[in-house]
C-alpha cells in the first residue's frame, strides 16, 4: 500500500519513542480496540502519534479537552503533515447563550450566539476532507460529540459540475439557493455567488483562499476555473468541481416536507396533552413557536433553531443518537484522545447538563419533546461509535487503564535525555519565605517559577506579598480569558516577569522550557488539586528544563504525595539508566515562543506584502505626532482583527508595539 501521509520533521524518534511507535502500530494492526500511551511531560507524545498515523495511513481524529490545546495540536500536526489535510473542528461560537427558562422567576432567555466565521469555514473544510480524502487528520474538541447535519443528506445536496455538462443557468442558481448560498453581486464573500452574463462566480463555504468561476455557453458548462476572490487572478482550470452546502444542516426539499408533516403530528399530540393538564399558556406557547418555525421552513428551507427538529430532518427514531462528526469518520478511522484523564470525564458529563436544560423548555411549552433528541452523545453511544482508540496522557485515568488492560505503552525516556524534576518536601510553616529565597535564586539565573496555591485568596495575597518584596510576579486565574492567558504565558517566557502564581496551572498542558522550579504550596491538603494525578501533572511543568525542580510544601506526606513522588523517582531512575547505557547527555529544549497558540489563518498566505507590525522599537522611524496617531489607529485595528481571527500571538505582539508607540506619542506631545 502506498503511503498517503508524508511526515516532515528534522527529528528522528529517540528515547522511548521508537518502542512506543512500534508497540502502538502492532496493537492497531492486531485489532486492539483500546491502547494507552502513558507518556511523561516533554517526551514527544504528539510526535509519537504523528509517526503512528504516518505508518498506518488511516484517517484520524484527535480529541483534545479544550480549544487551546486543540489549537496547539492542530499547529503541531500542520507542521508534521504540510502535504496532507490537517483540519480543525471546534465549536464555532465566540459567545453562546443557549435558550433556557427559569420557572422560579418566569424568565425566558432567548438563544444568543456570536459565530466565528473562520472556524465555521474550518469545520466545513474538515467534513469535506473526511468525505473526499484518506489522508485526513481532524483535531477536535468535545464539539465532535454534538449533533451535526446528517452526512447522507449532506452528500445528496452536493452540486457536481464538470466541463461539457449540460445544465441550465437557472438550474445552477436554484441548486445554489438550495445549498443556502445567497446571491450578492456587490460583496463577494464565503457562502455567496454572483452572476455576470453567462459567468457564475461561487465562493465555496469551506474555502478561505479560492473561488470557482463557472463559464457557460448557452446550456453547456464551457470552463471551470479557480481564482483568487480578492484579486480575481485565475489560478488554474479544473475538469470538475463539487460545491458543498453552506451549512451542515442543509436538507433536501422532500425531506423537509416530510419532516414538517411529522412535526405537525407531534404538535397536535402535544397540544392534547397540555390541554388535558390545563396548561393553557404552555399550549399557546408551543403552538405559536412551532407554527412560526414551520412557516419559515416552508418558505426558506430552514428556520432559527432548526437543530431542535434534527430527529425528523435526519430520519432517526426517538432516543436514537444524533448524527455527529463520528458519522463522517470512515469505518477504518483511528481515534486519539489527548489528555484523556480530562477529556473522557468531559465526554461523560455533556449529556446530563444539556438534558436538564431542555427538559425545562419542553415542560413549559417552549419546545416540542423531540427537541430532547438534539443533544450530545451519551457516553455509551460514544463508546459504540468510537473506532480503534489510543488514549494519551501522562496520568491516565481509571477508565483508560481498565479499557486498555495490559496494552499500556510507556514513554518515559525523553529524546532530549531530560530527566524528571528533583522533588523535595519542605515544611509549611516557612513556605512563603522559603519560596521567596528560591525565586531570587531562579530570577538571578534568568529562569522562571510556577507557584500553585489552593485558593484564589491565597494566590492574590501571595502575589501581593511577592510584589512588595520586589519580585516580578503575575497571577493567573479563571476570570482571565483565553487571549489574555496566552499573553501572560508568552510574557513569562519572554522574561517580562519571573513568577506566575495560579491555582490550577496544570490545566492548559503548558509547555514552558524556561520554567526551572514548580512550587506547590499546602501539598499535604488532600483533594482534587492535590491528588496524585494533579501533583504529577504540576510537577511535570518543570520537566522541560535542565535544572528542573519541584518543591512540595507539606508537614506530612499524604498518600497522593507519596505516590506522586514515588512515580517521579521511578521515572527519573529509568531515564538516568537509559542515558547512562546510551551515553546521552541531557539537552535543554529551545522551543520558539510563537508556538504557544497558532491557528493557520486565512490571511497568512495572501497578506505577505501587506502591513506587518515590526519587531523592535528601532524599526520605527522618528514619526511626527500626526503620523504617530495614524500608526497607532492602524495598529489598534490590526490588533482587534488578530484577536477576532484567534491569532492570539500576533494580537499580543501588536499590543506590545502599540504600547511602545503610545509612549513615543506621549513623549512627543
Curated annotation (Swiss-Prot):
User: Where would I find the Helicase ATP-binding domain in this sequence?
Assistant: 26-183
Q: Which GO terms describe its biological process?
A: nucleotide-excision repair; SOS response
Q: Which Gene Ontology cellular-component terms appear in the entry?
A: cytoplasm; excinuclease repair complex
Where is the Helicase C-terminal domain positioned along the sequence?
431-593
Chief localisation class? cytoplasm
Q: Does the keyword Methyltransferase apply?
A: no
Outline the extent of the UVR domain: 629-664
Localisation: Cytoplasm
Q: Which UniProt keywords apply?
A: ATP-binding, Cytoplasm, DNA damage, DNA excision, DNA repair, Excision nuclease, Helicase, Hydrolase, Nucleotide-binding, SOS response
> One Pfam family of this protein, by short name?
UVR
State a single Gene Ontology molecular function: ATP hydrolysis activity
Residues that hold ATP according to the record: 39-46
Motif Beta-hairpin in this chain: where? 92-115
What the entry lists under PROSITE patterns is as follows: HELICASE_ATP_BIND_1, HELICASE_CTER, UVR
Q: Which NCBIfam families does this UniProt record tie to the protein? A: PRK05298.1 (NF003673), uvrb (TIGR00631)
Give the record's subunit note.
Forms a heterotetramer with UvrA during the search for lesions. Interacts with UvrC in an incision complex.
Instruction: State the protein's purpose.
Output: The UvrABC repair system catalyzes the recognition and processing of DNA lesions. A damage recognition complex composed of 2 UvrA and 2 UvrB subunits scans DNA for abnormalities. Upon binding of the UvrA(2)B(2) complex to a putative damaged site, the DNA wraps around one UvrB monomer. DNA wrap is dependent on ATP binding by UvrB and probably causes local melting of the DNA helix, facilitating insertion of UvrB beta-hairpin between the DNA strands. Then UvrB probes one DNA strand for the presence of a lesion.
Q: What remark about domains does the record contain? A: The beta-hairpin motif is involved in DNA binding.
Q: Which family does it belong to?
A: Belongs to the UvrB family.
Q: What is this protein called?
A: UvrABC system protein B
What organism does the UniProt record list as the source?
A: Proteus mirabilis (strain HI4320)
